[in-house]
Amino acid sequence: MSKDIPTPYMWSFQPQMGLAAGAAQDYSSKMNWLSAGPHMISRVNGVRARRNQILLEQAALTATPRNQLNPPSWPAALIYQENPPPTTVLLPRDAQAEVHMTNAGAQLAGGARHSFRYKGRTEPYPSPAIKRVLIRGKGIQLNDEVTSPLGVRPDGVFQLGGSGRSSFTARQAYLTLQSSSSAPRSGGIGTLQFVEEFTPSVYFNPFSGSPGHYPDAFIPNFDAVSESVDGYD
């Protein structure tokens, strides 16, 4: 085979730290050319050269420009910040309170509270207490988007006074909650960013220069935690 067409170095991922754990050549991907003639060998070399060209183009498109190939801690500006999707929850309904509002009469919005005064009584009757259901959240904020034209009110016709009950079609009302992070994350990268940042590396003429210029990450016993090679100074 031609020495001018190297086998790419395949990177491995260290998920606990979110870093690349070194790279090694994948010789299992080589084609069987031992019994091939010159014409077949030429075609195989053409396929390998085209593969390396695709990898070089992919690395130029997806890799983030940075001073250090595999930094021990990625800054927040270079890390993909995950935005969790909004959470939609069903608003609690109190059917008994809604019926009580309809039968007894209540002011749904605006102005002061309703009070009922009867003949022969100096003080007005206080408005009956209506059970309120509180929604408590932890580290969430309301989303600006309105997911339902119904809003948060039940859709129907209410009778504000009198003894008759209203007939309304109870519909489910939803509330959209969106989580927010307090600060952008820094440190290790995720699997998706690793695949884009560390495409298989094409290293031409790896043994033609000084041994000190050979990347440590391409040595099989490279330790990504200590950023050193076992047995080497």
UniProtKB/Swiss-Prot annotation:
HAMAP family: ADV_CAP8 (MF_04049)
Subunit organization: Interacts with the peripentonal hexons as well as the hexons in the facets. Part of a complex composed of the core-capsid bridging protein, the endosome lysis protein VI and the hexon-linking protein VIII; these interactions bridge the virus core to the capsid.
Keyword list, A-Z: Capsid protein, Host nucleus, Late protein, Phosphoprotein, Virion
Statement: the UniProt record of this protein carries the keyword Ribosomal protein: no
Propeptide: 112-163
Upregulation: Expressed in the late phase of the viral replicative cycle.
Miscellaneous notes: All late proteins expressed from the major late promoter are produced by alternative splicing and alternative polyadenylation of the same gene giving rise to non-overlapping ORFs. A leader sequence is present in the N-terminus of all these mRNAs and is recognized by the viral shutoff protein to provide expression although conventional translation via ribosome scanning from the cap has been shut off in the host cell.
Keyword set includes Phosphoprotein: yes
Species name: Human adenovirus A serotype 12 (HAdV-12)
Entry protein name: Pre-hexon-linking protein VIII
Entry PTM: Cleaved by the viral protease during virion maturation. May cause the middle segment to be shed from the capsid.
Record-annotated site: Cleavage: 111-112, 163-164
Record-listed Phosphothreonine modification sites: 64
GO molecular function: hexon binding
Stated family: Belongs to the adenoviridae hexon-linking protein family.
Any Pfam family matching the protein: Adeno_PVIII
Gene Ontology cellular component annotations, sorted alphabetically: host cell nucleus; viral capsid
PTM sites of type Phosphoserine: 180
